[in-house]
């Protein structure tokens, strides 16, 4: 564990797959991460998969240029050249970038194909790498797979962990060590008591993916802890204006 001077930003803004929109950056790329850091986002969200040859690769979908990530070698996928000459990024590269500073953090989504055991294997590998690189202070974990989150908690008692799904009751989440909920913003319209219930249980609240300024305003008025967005600069400007009022 690396001792870090706590200068981390607390402005609620989580750049969804990094800051890519409007900047010519590929989603989940090194440039997108660096831009999120440059903008001053509280966090930069990204997605990880385990490749056939056991690398921890960064990509949103289960496919990458027609190749299924879990069934493909990293070297084959890296033959695909992305915007600005980049190739598929890996977790160690992201951790090296994020550890260059102590203002922006990572929000790491653990991904796997449904109904397989690779999710737990990925989880073990990810947490091990984060610990080996002393990057615990920079990394939060999220997933739709509840068993994956329980494994993270078993491996790291101090990590911040948020559940993306709505299957497991919040009471159970709290008992089993989940730190927060991470729901689509529409869930709070469907279930008006959701916010108050989460607050009563002491769970943090993240909402995704909020790109409409009117919904941004509504989520800020509600008082959520984090807002995941493809428009981080817009949200940052909105928050700055509100803070001056």
Model-derived segments and their meaning:
Residues 1-245:
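Phosphate-group recognition and catalysis centered on beta-loop-alpha active-site segments
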